[in-house]
Amino acid sequence: GMESKVIFIGPCVAKKTELYRSDVVDAIDCVLTFKELMVWLEQRGIDLSNCEESNFDEKPVRFAQLYPLPGGLIKTAGLKDDGLDTKLVRVDGFQNVKEIFHNIPKESSYTLIEPLFCSQGCINGPGISSIKNVFERRKDIIQYDRSIAGNDVVPEIYDEKIVKASYKKEEKIGKEVGEEEIQGILE
């Protein structure tokens, strides 16, 4: 109903600013990181280990759970990739993402660039709330994917609107700010 709200919950703090982009305005009401969700649950005295397990309302789209891993978008899109295809580029980590976008040749043969800002992908985002290391989290996601193998639900293709993001190399360097000015801003 009209009182319903859409909340994005994930590891990505960048989603908090994406919430205000003109192409998605009013699509999402609130963004929470996993850390914020855990704090909220704790404040309300909710212990997940005491909650009954339940299934998703709908079957998950095949491979969608791999999305937060490097190569996950490519796999979810149904593209064939063994990691050696020069037209499909998966890149993770700020420096690597910056490097690929600053060095794309004008006549590029790339079909798709999958940039994940966080090293090792979204499973290593700053909003993660897990005691497991990134490699254990990766293994858990892959095992979960394999546990639902055979579920070949493929999403419908929607003509309504295809959102496309483009990148234009544009360096903007502002004036240098001194320590005194920084302290003044923080006070």
Where are these regions (language model features)?
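Iron-sulfur-associated redox domains of electron-transfer enzymes in respiratory
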Residues: 1-184
